[in-house]
């Protein structure tokens, strides 16, 4: 089967975000010779991308299966667990989603993700080894990802992350979060973006912020808007949802909706509290 190198399909899980989104936006603007299609698992994401004026398909739709058979490049930002049969023979461009400072993928030896990771490498190892190009951002990260993911050096691409290097303005949601929360234009924006814990993705937020009332008092006194941006594996945690329900109307707290790409407003962020990456 001959694949068309001028058709690129993209996916970043269950949202329009991440490095695939930023490369998607860049190619649409600067490479009109390439057809770009955003692939979706759910109708709400497909409809959202279509409302932006872009082409989008569901993986399990007739149109989606057709475009998967034709496309030459599949852009992702993770080592996917599932590759649809229609993707056989496609080139995978893995942009990854954050620099590495912990054990990932093949080097994971415990935690709640270990079994899923082991299964996907048993199932997909041939694809990872033979069809996947992998983006790395430095010599240090080359060594890290070669060890952690079993990537051969000749399959590495050395470049910056699209979400950090693409300078085209992108606006897929209202950016004036100060006004949305009723704060003044000179309010400072601070983002708190922790990653999940390997051995406990649940009951994290109250341990991290034991006195929310005191925190909100300080934020109000300092005229700070604190954006709580949880990892997708944490945002559905019962404890986090309880805190969100109790404090979401506080003008100095914004519980971030991961459907919105926080990188669109990064130029307006004054400080970030992070412990890994902002994916």
Residue positions per predicted region:
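Catalytic donor nucleotide-activated moiety binding site of glycosyltransferases and closely related
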Residues: 35-51, 216-257
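Conserved catalytic-core segment of nucleotide-activated headgroup transferases in glycan assembly
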Residues: 15-25, 29, 148, 158, ...
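Nucleotide-activated donor-dependent transferases that construct or modify glycoconjugates
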Residues: 1-14, 195
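Active-site and donor-binding regions of nucleotide-sugar-utilizing enzymes
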Residues: 8-171
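Glycine-rich nucleotide phosphate-binding loop and flanking beta-alpha elements
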Residues: 81-82, 141-143, 198, 234, ...
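Nucleotide donor/acceptor-binding cores
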Residues: 5-6, 90, 187-190
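Donor nucleotide-activated moiety binding/catalytic core segment of transferases
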Residues: 57-71, 232-279
């Amino acid at each position: 089967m001959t694949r068309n190198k001028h058709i690129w399909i993209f996916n970043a899980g269950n949202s329009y975000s991440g490095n695939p989104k930023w490369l998607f936006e860049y190619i649409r603007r600067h490479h009109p010779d390439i057809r770009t299609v955003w692939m979706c698992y759910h109708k709400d994401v497909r409809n959202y991308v279509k409302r932006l004026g872009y082409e989008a398909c569901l993986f399990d739709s007739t149109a989606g299966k057709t475009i998967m058979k034709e496309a030459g490049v599949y852009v992702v930002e993770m080592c996917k667990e599932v590759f649809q049969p229609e993707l056989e023979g496609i080139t995978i461009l893995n942009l990854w989603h954050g620099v590495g400072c912990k054990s990932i993928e093949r080097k994971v030896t415990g935690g709640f993700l270990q079994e899923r990771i082991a299964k996907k490498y048993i199932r997909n190892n041939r694809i990872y080894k033979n069809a996947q190009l992998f983006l790395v951002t430095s010599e240090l990260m080359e060594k890290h990802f070669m060890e952690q993911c079993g990537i051969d050096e000749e399959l590495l691409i050395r470049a910056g992350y699209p979400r950090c290097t693409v300078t085209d303005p992108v606006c897929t949601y209202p950016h004036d979060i100060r006004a949305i929360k009723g704060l003044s234009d000179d309010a400072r924006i601070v983002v708190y973006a922790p990653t999940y814990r390997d051995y406990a993705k649940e009951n994290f937020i109250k341990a991290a912020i034991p006195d929310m009332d005191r925190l909100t008092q300080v934020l109000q006194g300092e005229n700070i808007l604190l954006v709580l941006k949880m990892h997708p594996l944490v945002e559905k945690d019962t404890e986090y949802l309880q805190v969100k329900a109790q404090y979401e109307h506080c003008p100095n707290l914004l519980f971030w909706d991961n459907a919105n790409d926080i990188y669109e407003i990064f130029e307006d962020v004054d400080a970030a509290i992070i412990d890994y990456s902002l994916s």
